[in-house]
Amino acid sequence: GSITVESVLNVNASGVIGGNSAKKGVSVSGIDGKASSATAKAESVNIAYVNNGVLEAARGKASISANTSSKTDAQALAPNFSLSLAEMNIVNVYTDSNDSVEAYVTGASRVSALKVDILANGTAEVTATGAVPGVTVSLVNGNAVIVTATAAKGTNGKVTKAYVGRDSEVYANGVTENENTVHSLKVSAESNLTITAKVPETKSIGALKLGVFLVKTIAGKTDTWAAILGKAESTNDIFVLATDKITETSNVELFSAGLVAGGASRAENTVESQNSSVQIGDGAVLKAWGNIQAQAVTKTNAQTQIQDAAYGGGTNCSVESKNNITRKTSLVIGNNVNITSVIGNIELLAEEDKTSHIESIATGSSGSVYAGGGPKAEINYNSTVTATVGNGGNIDARYGTLDIKAIANTDLYADAYRKAAAAAGSNKSEANINSNVTVVTNISKNGAKTRILGEVTTIGAYIENQVILAKAKSYTASAGSKTEAYATSNVNNNVSTGVDNAW
């Protein structure tokens, strides 16, 4: 039969607070600077492992898997009565989520079965929602709406790991009969993180005198890692896969408010450190009769969108839409490895997903007289993709193809637009993109010679797809106004391939 070592964890956290018109039935009457405030946090650790053990399933499969699914939700519904206060936050929403998921075989362990899976999967959804008051609010100073959704801000961030330890051995020895019964060896770590911060549509609220809207998501550090550090053999295929996916959305759909003069409202996404890596450790042995694939992938989708009032902002008001993204994708093949595909292909890849897309949109419009300010759309993007092969090893696919590649894909779009239907002292839209991309493949740098053999061998570093578009447009209906639009793209690409000591 089959052997399963499985750990499943579902985590849910929520915080809701509402005004006297809220369906939740919570009445908020205290005016203490936090009229509507909601917080939700979640943190979890989930591990499935075999340590110094022997698992043998001669006629079945062996599966070691850890799966965590978490949802964190905070909602604040502003009170539906008149407020008059000098300094206060009408809505303050905060969420945070951190989880650690690991599946591994370590110590002097031996796992043998027709099919072997070592799988770690962590899925997290984080949502923060804040609604503005439904009646008149008079503010002299201070922010009106603050909505923050964060994840992976803990000490270690969001961790997802699947690996075979240095002294462990794993064997998949099944015979594939058809496409539905493929007996392979798979080590896979997959992380999915979705973060959303939003202010729902606030059309026709009336003469609100709000300060600013600050709506933002923050992904701290994700660490997704798959590795074989010991010995792995398969009569079919071997897969070592790490996939890290982040989706961020910050959205202010529409607000109709005569904003306090000088207010800068902002929708912002930040990915502080996204990491996906695959490692074949020093001295590791991988042998497959079929294909061997070691692949690290990052996927990043981030959208910020903000639109100011159809009825106009105050003097020198502005709206900003901003994305700050840092991602790293890496493949590390250690020293003195022995990787052999008897009759198949070997694919060693560090790759950014082609469907990744980052977008900042800021829209300003007004039917009233105002002066100064304008929309700004900005993207700050830093990406590193590396594939590194160490010294003194042997990589052999003599009857198939051998690929060692680092591949980057970039799709950035910033759009700022303002339409002024009446006289404006100035009307300026700005769109800025700053992009830094580094793609590097290195083979046997500064050390003993590595043997590389394939019927067809490709070693390279590539930017396969790069779309960078910054667009700014300003329109003023009346004469006598200063109308400006600025769009800039600063792009720095560094692509290199080095084969120092290989044959």
Protein language model regions, located:
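Low-complexity, glycine- and small/polar-enriched segments
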Residues: 1-503
